[in-house]
């Protein structure tokens, strides 16, 4: 922040004082500029003279007539990078993503935003929602008296908000403190409004820690559909347990017709786990999923084949909630010709990125590395395009069908 101190000292020397609004604008600008200078993966961010960028944009911040104008100037500065995952989100939007709820308590439902509606796509069998008769395909209209539609419409209208953030905003409104209750109003299968008061119990899975992040519940499930193996886990975390479970699932499937790995809604986690899991699926040594470029290091996602490798067809299921390590895993195996990808385009958020709040209250997102898949594709801002695009629909869920899973099962059946 040395430039902020310099300019404020200079202003004081010449008898110029700044209003609190202007001080906030300057502090926010300096936060953005300094962060890019210090944390971008390129020493010259975007190939630019970043010092010259400061000299160009700082006077414009001083002359900005409003907070909106100052934010527009900062966005223009970030636009010079011509790189994704660098953005400023208005405080109101940032707050909408964070929500007012949140907590470790869940009514036991999973949801996705389908065609602008919050649709129930999963139910925990013993959850309060299941006991209350909630069904797949029901639409969640409101939580504790607050409609969800206005929030979704507002977030979807902001081009900087991707599906991952949208799902996060919904999730925060459908959770709360363990032991409490939440009132949800649904649209049932007959399009009738029904209200349910649901108990909030601990979210599915086991608590896992990663770095300085708060504990997060990680679950892993494995089952078979006929002779096709199926695994699903919600995050690439809890390394020892999840890797062990994945290995056991693959090991129990040596005679399976195929294997389905469901990464829908999986926001990623530890990148190295993608390499480890791929080792159970790729038998050739020295294969790579891709390469990550950081300021002081380059990380090759090299696959080390296991002693026993599953050789059958592999299908990976993805959607707009699949991000980071999920994208690295899916695109890497797709590029190597080892897996076929089903679903909808992923979050296009493969890079390690950080959200911070600026002094003016706005949200600031920035990336700290670049990633190129083995096929030469930059996933950031582009995402993984499925080999077979299939969308979940409310109608299908009400009828008991998961169209994405069904498509993968049909493909494996035809490969027999």
What label would you give each PLM region?
Residues 175-359, 370, 397, 411-416:
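Cleft-lining beta-strand/loop regions that shape enzyme active-site pockets
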Residues 15-17:
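Boundary at the C-terminal end of the N-terminal hydrophobic targeting segment
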Residues 19-48:
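Mature N-terminal segment immediately following signal peptide/propeptide cleavage
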Residues 63, 69, 136-183, 247, ...:
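PDZ domains, with a preference for the canonical peptide-binding region formed by the helix
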Residues 129-161, 260-264, 333-336, 341, ...:
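Conserved PDZ fold ligand-binding element
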Residues 100-150, 238-239, 369-370:
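PDZ/PDZ-like domain segments forming the peptide/carboxylate-binding groove
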Residues 44-116, 178-183, 187-221:
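Extended, small/polar residue-biased N-terminal targeting/export presequences
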Residues 32, 77, 109, 129, ...:
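Terminal peptide-recognition signature
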């Amino acid at each position: 922040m040395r430039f902020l101190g310099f300019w404020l000292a200079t202003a004081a020397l010449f008898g110029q004082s700044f209003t609190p609004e202007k001080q906030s604008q300057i502090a926010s600008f300096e936060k953005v500029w300094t962060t890019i200078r210090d944390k971008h993966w390129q020493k010259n961010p975007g190939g630019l003279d970043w010092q010259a960028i400061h000299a160009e944009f700082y006077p414009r911040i001083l002359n900005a007539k409003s907070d909106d104008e100052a934010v527009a100037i900062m966005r223009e500065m970030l636009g010079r990078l011509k790189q994704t995952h660098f953005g400023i989100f208005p405080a109101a939007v940032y707050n909408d993503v964070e929500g007012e709820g949140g907590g470790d308590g869940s009514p036991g439902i999973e949801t996705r935003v389908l065609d602008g509606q919050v649709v129930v796509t999963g139910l925990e069998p013993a959850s309060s929602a299941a006991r209350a008769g909630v069904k797949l395909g029901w639409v969640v209209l409101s939580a504790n008296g607050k409609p969800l539609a206005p929030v979704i419409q507002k977030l979807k209208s902001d081009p900087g908000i991707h599906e991952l953030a949208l799902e996060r905003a919904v999730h925060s409104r459908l959770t709360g403190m363990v032991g409490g209750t939440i009132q949800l109003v649904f649209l049932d299968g007959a399009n009738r409004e029904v209200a349910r008061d649901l108990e909030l119990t601990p979210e599915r899975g086991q608590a896992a820690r990663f770095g300085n992040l708060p504990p997060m519940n990680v679950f892993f499930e494995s089952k078979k559909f006929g002779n096709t193996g199926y695994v699903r886990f919600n995050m690439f975390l809890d390394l020892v347990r999840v890797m062990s479970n994945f290995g056991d699932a693959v090991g129990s499937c040596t005679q399976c017709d195929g294997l389905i790995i469901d990464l829908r809604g999986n926001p990623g986690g530890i990148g190295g786990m993608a390499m480890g899991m791929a080792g159970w699926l790729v038998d050739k040594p020295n294969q790579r999923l891709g390469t990550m470029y950081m300021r002081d290091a380059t990380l090759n996602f090299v696959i080390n084949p296991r002693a026993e490798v599953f050789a059958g067809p592999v299908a990976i299921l993805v959607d707009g909630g699949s991000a980071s390590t999920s994208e690295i895993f899916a695109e890497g195996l797709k590029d190597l010709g080892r897996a076929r990808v089903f679903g909808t385009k992923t979050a296009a958020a493969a890079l390690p990125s950080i959200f911070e709040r600026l002094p003016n209250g706005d949200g600031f997102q920035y990336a700290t590395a670049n990633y190129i898949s083995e096929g030469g594709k930059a996933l950031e801002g582009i995402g993984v395009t499925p080999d077979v695009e299939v969308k979940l629909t409310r109608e299908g869920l009400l009828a008991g069908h998961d169209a994405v899973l069904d498509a993968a099962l049909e493909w494996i059946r035809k490969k027999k």
